[in-house]
Protein backbone atom coordinates (compact mmCIF):
# COMPACT_ATOMS: atom_id res chain seq x y z
CA UNK A 1 0.00 0.00 0.00
CA UNK A 2 1.34 3.39 -0.99
CA UNK A 3 0.97 6.46 1.20
CA UNK A 4 1.72 9.68 -0.67
CA UNK A 5 2.68 12.45 1.73
CA UNK A 6 3.05 16.08 0.64
CA UNK A 7 5.75 17.80 2.68
CA UNK A 8 9.12 16.25 3.56
CA UNK A 9 9.92 18.76 6.29
CA UNK A 10 10.46 17.97 9.96
CA UNK A 11 6.76 17.48 10.72
CA UNK A 12 6.22 15.37 7.61
CA UNK A 13 9.14 13.08 8.38
CA UNK A 14 9.04 13.09 12.16
CA UNK A 15 5.30 12.86 12.72
CA UNK A 16 2.97 11.85 9.87
CA UNK A 17 5.50 9.99 7.73
CA UNK A 18 6.65 7.95 10.72
CA UNK A 19 3.08 7.00 11.68
CA UNK A 20 2.27 6.00 8.10
CA UNK A 21 5.38 3.80 8.08
CA UNK A 22 4.32 2.19 11.37
CA UNK A 23 0.92 1.51 9.81
CA UNK A 24 2.48 -0.61 7.06
CA UNK A 25 2.45 1.85 4.17
CA UNK A 26 5.19 2.37 1.61
CA UNK A 27 5.74 6.07 2.20
CA UNK A 28 6.53 8.36 -0.73
CA UNK A 29 7.22 12.00 0.06
CA UNK A 30 6.33 14.76 -2.41
CA UNK A 31 8.25 18.00 -1.98
CA UNK A 32 9.76 20.83 -4.02
CA UNK A 33 13.04 20.84 -2.08
CA UNK A 34 15.31 18.98 -4.48
CA UNK A 35 18.05 18.57 -1.88
CA UNK A 36 15.67 16.84 0.52
CA UNK A 37 14.16 14.71 -2.26
CA UNK A 38 17.60 13.60 -3.46
CA UNK A 39 18.75 12.74 0.07
CA UNK A 40 15.65 10.66 0.77
CA UNK A 41 16.09 8.75 -2.48
CA UNK A 42 19.79 8.24 -1.82
CA UNK A 43 19.49 7.08 1.81
CA UNK A 44 16.01 5.52 1.50
CA UNK A 45 15.60 5.99 5.26
CA UNK A 46 15.91 8.58 8.00
CA UNK A 47 16.27 8.78 11.78
CA UNK A 48 13.60 10.00 14.20
CA UNK A 49 14.79 10.88 17.69
CA UNK A 50 12.50 11.33 20.71
CA UNK A 51 13.41 14.52 22.53
CA UNK A 52 13.52 13.19 26.08
CA UNK A 53 16.05 11.85 28.55
CA UNK A 54 16.38 8.51 26.79
CA UNK A 55 17.09 10.00 23.37
CA UNK A 56 15.49 6.92 21.80
CA UNK A 57 15.95 6.72 18.04
CA UNK A 58 14.39 4.67 15.28
CA UNK A 59 15.02 4.27 11.59
CA UNK A 60 12.08 4.99 9.28
CA UNK A 61 12.44 3.20 5.97
CA UNK A 62 12.45 2.22 3.27
CA UNK A 63 11.01 5.48 1.95
CA UNK A 64 11.28 7.38 -1.32
CA UNK A 65 10.51 10.86 -2.61
CA UNK A 66 9.61 12.82 -5.72
CA UNK A 67 9.98 16.46 -6.68
CA UNK A 68 6.35 17.42 -7.20
CA UNK A 69 7.34 20.57 -9.09
CA UNK A 70 9.09 18.73 -11.93
CA UNK A 71 7.99 15.08 -11.74
CA UNK A 72 4.36 15.77 -12.55
CA UNK A 73 3.62 12.55 -14.43
CA UNK A 74 5.06 10.45 -11.62
CA UNK A 75 2.98 12.44 -9.13
CA UNK A 76 -0.20 11.69 -11.09
CA UNK A 77 0.66 7.98 -11.17
CA UNK A 78 1.18 7.98 -7.42
CA UNK A 79 -2.17 9.69 -6.86
CA UNK A 80 -3.73 6.89 -8.90
CA UNK A 81 -1.92 4.15 -6.97
CA UNK A 82 -2.01 5.58 -3.44
CA UNK A 83 -4.20 4.09 -0.73
CA UNK A 84 -3.97 7.31 1.27
CA UNK A 85 -2.69 10.85 0.71
CA UNK A 86 -1.64 13.15 3.55
CA UNK A 87 -0.18 16.65 3.81
CA UNK A 88 2.01 18.58 6.24
CA UNK A 89 2.91 21.60 4.14
CA UNK A 90 1.46 24.51 6.12
CA UNK A 91 -2.00 26.04 5.65
CA UNK A 92 -0.83 28.57 3.06
CA UNK A 93 0.64 25.89 0.79
CA UNK A 94 -2.54 23.80 0.49
CA UNK A 95 -3.78 26.08 -2.30
CA UNK A 96 -0.52 25.58 -4.15
CA UNK A 97 -0.70 21.77 -4.20
CA UNK A 98 -4.44 21.69 -4.98
CA UNK A 99 -4.06 21.98 -8.80
CA UNK A 100 -1.69 18.98 -8.92
CA UNK A 101 -3.98 16.89 -6.74
CA UNK A 102 -6.95 17.89 -8.90
CA UNK A 103 -5.13 16.87 -12.08
CA UNK A 104 -4.13 13.57 -10.51
CA UNK A 105 -7.72 12.87 -9.48
CA UNK A 106 -8.94 13.68 -13.01
CA UNK A 107 -6.60 11.04 -14.39
CA UNK A 108 -7.30 8.50 -11.65
CA UNK A 109 -8.53 5.18 -13.01
CA UNK A 110 -8.55 3.19 -9.77
CA UNK A 111 -11.98 2.48 -8.31
CA UNK A 112 -10.51 1.79 -4.86
CA UNK A 113 -11.40 4.26 -2.09
CA UNK A 114 -8.86 7.03 -1.54
CA UNK A 115 -8.71 9.34 1.46
CA UNK A 116 -6.88 12.67 1.49
CA UNK A 117 -6.08 14.03 4.96
CA UNK A 118 -4.60 17.48 5.55
CA UNK A 119 -2.52 17.29 8.74
CA UNK A 120 -2.13 21.00 9.28
CA UNK A 121 -2.25 23.39 12.23
CA UNK A 122 -5.66 24.70 11.18
CA UNK A 123 -9.34 23.95 11.63
CA UNK A 124 -10.98 22.08 8.75
CA UNK A 125 -7.78 21.58 6.77
CA UNK A 126 -9.06 18.68 4.65
CA UNK A 127 -12.32 20.51 3.91
CA UNK A 128 -10.29 23.55 2.89
CA UNK A 129 -8.11 21.40 0.62
CA UNK A 130 -11.17 19.72 -0.91
CA UNK A 131 -12.66 23.11 -1.77
CA UNK A 132 -9.36 24.19 -3.33
CA UNK A 133 -9.09 20.95 -5.32
CA UNK A 134 -12.71 21.09 -6.47
CA UNK A 135 -12.08 24.60 -7.75
CA UNK A 136 -10.04 22.96 -10.52
CA UNK A 137 -12.67 20.35 -11.43
CA UNK A 138 -15.84 20.49 -13.50
CA UNK A 139 -19.16 19.55 -11.92
CA UNK A 140 -19.04 16.15 -13.61
CA UNK A 141 -15.49 15.55 -12.38
CA UNK A 142 -16.52 16.51 -8.85
CA UNK A 143 -19.30 13.94 -8.88
CA UNK A 144 -16.88 11.22 -9.98
CA UNK A 145 -14.34 12.16 -7.31
CA UNK A 146 -17.00 12.22 -4.59
CA UNK A 147 -17.84 8.57 -5.31
CA UNK A 148 -14.45 7.19 -4.26
CA UNK A 149 -12.46 9.98 -2.58
CA UNK A 150 -12.87 11.22 0.99
CA UNK A 151 -11.41 14.31 2.66
CA UNK A 152 -11.75 13.60 6.40
CA UNK A 153 -10.73 16.49 8.62
CA UNK A 154 -8.17 15.91 11.34
CA UNK A 155 -6.50 17.59 14.30
CA UNK A 156 -2.77 17.12 14.85
CA UNK A 157 -0.56 17.94 17.79
CA UNK A 158 3.16 17.37 18.18
CA UNK A 159 5.91 19.86 18.94
CA UNK A 160 8.61 19.63 16.29
CA UNK A 161 10.95 22.57 16.89
CA UNK A 162 13.34 24.21 14.45
CA UNK A 163 16.52 22.13 14.67
CA UNK A 164 19.91 21.53 13.12
CA UNK A 165 21.62 18.14 12.84
CA UNK A 166 24.78 16.95 11.14
CA UNK A 167 22.52 14.49 9.31
CA UNK A 168 19.98 16.71 7.47
CA UNK A 169 17.42 13.88 7.38
CA UNK A 170 17.43 13.34 11.14
CA UNK A 171 14.51 14.89 13.01
CA UNK A 172 13.84 15.28 16.74
CA UNK A 173 10.25 15.24 18.00
CA UNK A 174 8.65 15.33 21.43
CA UNK A 175 7.33 11.97 22.69
CA UNK A 176 3.74 13.24 22.92
CA UNK A 177 1.57 13.27 19.81
CA UNK A 178 -2.11 13.35 18.94
CA UNK A 179 -3.72 12.70 15.55
CA UNK A 180 -7.51 12.75 15.72
CA UNK A 181 -9.50 12.06 12.54
CA UNK A 182 -13.18 12.52 11.72
CA UNK A 183 -14.24 9.00 10.78
CA UNK A 184 -17.45 10.26 9.14
CA UNK A 185 -15.40 11.76 6.29
CA UNK A 186 -13.78 8.55 5.05
CA UNK A 187 -14.50 7.03 1.67
CA UNK A 188 -14.81 3.27 2.06
CA UNK A 189 -13.78 1.67 5.31
CA UNK A 190 -11.65 3.22 8.02
CA UNK A 191 -7.98 2.76 7.05
CA UNK A 192 -5.30 1.36 9.33
CA UNK A 193 -3.52 4.29 10.95
CA UNK A 194 -1.63 3.23 14.07
CA UNK A 195 -1.59 5.88 16.76
CA UNK A 196 -4.54 7.82 15.32
CA UNK A 197 -7.76 8.38 17.25
CA UNK A 198 -11.02 8.27 15.27
CA UNK A 199 -14.11 10.20 16.32
CA UNK A 200 -17.58 11.08 15.04
CA UNK A 201 -17.20 14.68 16.24
CA UNK A 202 -13.86 16.40 15.80
CA UNK A 203 -14.89 19.79 17.21
CA UNK A 204 -14.22 19.06 20.92
CA UNK A 205 -10.72 17.80 20.14
CA UNK A 206 -9.93 20.72 17.83
CA UNK A 207 -11.03 23.32 20.36
CA UNK A 208 -9.36 21.51 23.27
CA UNK A 209 -6.07 21.52 21.38
CA UNK A 210 -6.44 25.09 20.07
CA UNK A 211 -7.52 26.54 23.41
CA UNK A 212 -5.01 24.58 25.52
CA UNK A 213 -1.88 23.79 23.51
CA UNK A 214 -1.96 26.76 21.14
CA UNK A 215 -3.28 29.20 23.74
CA UNK A 216 -0.75 28.08 26.33
CA UNK A 217 2.11 28.17 23.85
CA UNK A 218 1.13 31.67 22.68
CA UNK A 219 0.72 33.13 26.17
CA UNK A 220 4.07 31.62 27.21
CA UNK A 221 5.79 33.11 24.16
CA UNK A 222 4.24 36.59 24.19
CA UNK A 223 4.62 37.15 27.95
CA UNK A 224 8.07 35.56 27.84
CA UNK A 225 9.13 37.92 25.05
CA UNK A 226 8.02 40.92 27.11
CA UNK A 227 10.19 39.65 29.97
CA UNK A 228 13.21 39.36 27.69
CA UNK A 229 13.38 35.56 27.80
CA UNK A 230 14.64 33.62 24.79
CA UNK A 231 13.07 30.16 24.89
CA UNK A 232 9.72 28.64 25.78
CA UNK A 233 11.40 26.53 28.46
CA UNK A 234 12.93 29.63 30.07
CA UNK A 235 9.60 31.42 29.93
CA UNK A 236 7.49 28.64 31.45
CA UNK A 237 10.15 28.27 34.16
CA UNK A 238 9.58 31.87 35.27
CA UNK A 239 7.14 31.74 38.25
CA UNK A 240 5.06 34.76 37.22
CA UNK A 241 4.78 33.65 33.58
CA UNK A 242 3.87 30.13 34.66
CA UNK A 243 1.10 31.59 36.82
CA UNK A 244 -0.30 33.60 33.90
CA UNK A 245 -0.21 30.54 31.62
CA UNK A 246 -1.81 28.29 34.24
CA UNK A 247 -4.54 30.87 34.90
CA UNK A 248 -5.16 31.35 31.16
CA UNK A 249 -5.59 27.61 30.65
CA UNK A 250 -7.86 27.43 33.69
CA UNK A 251 -10.01 30.07 31.99
CA UNK A 252 -10.14 28.20 28.69
CA UNK A 253 -10.71 24.97 30.59
CA UNK A 254 -13.80 26.45 32.21
CA UNK A 255 -15.30 26.94 28.76
CA UNK A 256 -14.18 23.57 27.36
CA UNK A 257 -15.56 21.56 30.28
CA UNK A 258 -18.88 23.35 30.07
CA UNK A 259 -19.17 23.25 26.27
CA UNK A 260 -18.08 19.67 25.59
CA UNK A 261 -18.56 17.76 28.81
CA UNK A 262 -14.92 16.96 29.48
CA UNK A 263 -14.49 15.76 33.05
CA UNK A 264 -12.96 18.52 35.17
CA UNK A 265 -10.34 16.24 36.74
CA UNK A 266 -9.32 14.76 33.38
CA UNK A 267 -9.05 18.17 31.77
CA UNK A 268 -6.87 19.43 34.61
CA UNK A 269 -4.54 16.48 34.02
CA UNK A 270 -4.50 17.28 30.29
CA UNK A 271 -3.70 20.91 31.08
CA UNK A 272 -0.81 19.95 33.37
CA UNK A 273 0.50 17.56 30.72
CA UNK A 274 0.53 20.40 28.17
CA UNK A 275 2.43 22.71 30.52
CA UNK A 276 4.85 19.83 31.13
CA UNK A 277 5.50 19.66 27.39
CA UNK A 278 6.54 23.32 27.39
CA UNK A 279 9.04 22.46 30.14
CA UNK A 280 10.79 19.76 28.08
CA UNK A 281 14.49 20.51 28.54
CA UNK A 282 15.36 18.57 25.41
CA UNK A 283 13.39 20.89 23.12
CA UNK A 284 14.75 24.36 22.42
CA UNK A 285 12.00 26.52 20.97
CA UNK A 286 12.51 30.28 20.68
CA UNK A 287 9.67 32.47 21.89
CA UNK A 288 10.02 34.53 18.71
CA UNK A 289 9.18 31.45 16.61
CA UNK A 290 6.13 30.53 18.68
CA UNK A 291 4.97 34.16 18.80
CA UNK A 292 5.35 34.82 15.07
CA UNK A 293 2.35 35.94 12.97
CA UNK A 294 0.61 37.96 15.72
CA UNK A 295 -1.99 39.40 13.32
CA UNK A 296 -3.29 35.89 12.65
CA UNK A 297 -2.99 34.75 16.24
CA UNK A 298 -4.90 37.81 17.48
CA UNK A 299 -7.84 36.95 15.20
CA UNK A 300 -11.35 36.85 16.64
CA UNK A 301 -11.60 33.06 16.44
CA UNK A 302 -8.00 32.17 17.16
CA UNK A 303 -6.17 30.97 20.27
CA UNK A 304 -6.28 34.12 22.40
CA UNK A 305 -9.33 36.21 21.56
CA UNK A 306 -11.48 33.19 20.64
CA UNK A 307 -11.63 31.68 24.14
CA UNK A 308 -11.48 35.08 25.87
CA UNK A 309 -14.77 36.02 24.21
CA UNK A 310 -16.44 32.88 25.56
CA UNK A 311 -15.87 33.34 29.30
CA UNK A 312 -16.93 35.91 31.90
CA UNK A 313 -13.61 36.95 33.46
CA UNK A 314 -10.73 36.39 31.02
CA UNK A 315 -8.10 38.21 33.06
CA UNK A 316 -5.12 35.99 32.26
CA UNK A 317 -6.16 35.66 28.62
CA UNK A 318 -6.42 39.45 28.45
CA UNK A 319 -2.87 39.64 29.77
CA UNK A 320 -1.80 37.33 26.96
CA UNK A 321 -3.63 39.47 24.39
CA UNK A 322 -1.96 42.59 25.77
CA UNK A 323 1.46 40.95 25.52
CA UNK A 324 0.72 39.91 21.93
CA UNK A 325 -0.20 43.50 21.07
CA UNK A 326 3.24 44.57 22.35
CA UNK A 327 5.10 41.96 20.27
CA UNK A 328 7.53 44.04 18.19
CA UNK A 329 10.08 41.52 16.91
CA UNK A 330 11.62 43.22 13.88
CA UNK A 331 12.27 40.01 11.92
CA UNK A 332 8.56 39.14 11.91
CA UNK A 333 6.69 41.03 9.15
CA UNK A 334 3.35 40.66 10.95
CA UNK A 335 4.82 42.05 14.18
CA UNK A 336 6.15 45.05 12.25
CA UNK A 337 2.76 45.54 10.58
CA UNK A 338 0.95 45.22 13.92
CA UNK A 339 3.06 47.94 15.54
CA UNK A 340 2.55 50.14 12.48
CA UNK A 341 -1.24 49.73 12.76
CA UNK A 342 -1.18 50.54 16.48
CA UNK A 343 0.92 53.66 15.84
CA UNK A 344 -1.37 54.84 13.04
CA UNK A 345 -4.82 53.86 14.34
CA UNK A 346 -4.41 53.36 18.06
CA UNK A 347 -4.84 50.24 20.17
CA UNK A 348 -8.60 50.54 20.51
CA UNK A 349 -9.11 50.51 16.74
CA UNK A 350 -6.73 47.55 16.35
CA UNK A 351 -8.70 45.64 18.99
CA UNK A 352 -11.82 46.23 16.90
CA UNK A 353 -10.38 45.68 13.41
CA UNK A 354 -7.87 42.88 14.03
CA UNK A 355 -9.21 41.15 17.13
CA UNK A 356 -12.93 41.68 16.56
CA UNK A 357 -13.29 43.04 20.12
CA UNK A 358 -15.82 45.85 19.92
CA UNK A 359 -16.04 48.87 22.21
CA UNK A 360 -19.13 47.60 24.03
CA UNK A 361 -17.53 44.27 24.94
CA UNK A 362 -16.06 44.03 28.47
CA UNK A 363 -12.97 42.33 27.02
CA UNK A 364 -12.09 45.56 25.20
CA UNK A 365 -11.74 47.47 28.46
CA UNK A 366 -9.97 44.61 30.24
CA UNK A 367 -7.25 44.42 27.58
CA UNK A 368 -6.73 48.19 27.57
CA UNK A 369 -6.42 48.11 31.36
CA UNK A 370 -3.78 45.37 31.11
CA UNK A 371 -1.85 47.44 28.57
CA UNK A 372 -1.82 50.43 30.91
CA UNK A 373 -0.63 48.49 33.96
From Swiss-Prot:
Reaction catalysed by this enzyme: D-mannitol 1-phosphate + NAD(+) = beta-D-fructose 6-phosphate + NADH + H(+)
SUPFAM superfamilies cross-referenced by the UniProt entry: 6-phosphogluconate dehydrogenase C-terminal domain-like, NAD(P)-binding Rossmann-fold domains
An example molecular function term from Gene Ontology annotations: mannitol-1-phosphate 5-dehydrogenase activity
GO terms under cellular component: cytosol
Keyword NAD in record: yes
Swiss-Prot/TrEMBL keywords: NAD, Oxidoreductase
Family named by the database record: Belongs to the mannitol dehydrogenase family.
Protein name as it appears in the record: Mannitol-1-phosphate 5-dehydrogenase
Amino acid sequence: MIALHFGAGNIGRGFIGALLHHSGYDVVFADVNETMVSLLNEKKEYTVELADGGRQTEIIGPVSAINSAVQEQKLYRLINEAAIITTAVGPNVLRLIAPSIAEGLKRRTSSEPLNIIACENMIGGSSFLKKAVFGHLTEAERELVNRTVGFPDSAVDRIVPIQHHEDPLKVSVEPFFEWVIDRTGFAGGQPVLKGALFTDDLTPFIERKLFTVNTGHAVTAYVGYQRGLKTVKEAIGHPEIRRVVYDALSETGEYLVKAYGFKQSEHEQYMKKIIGRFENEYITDDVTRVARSPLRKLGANDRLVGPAKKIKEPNALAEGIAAALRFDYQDDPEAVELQKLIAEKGTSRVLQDICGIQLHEPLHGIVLKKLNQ
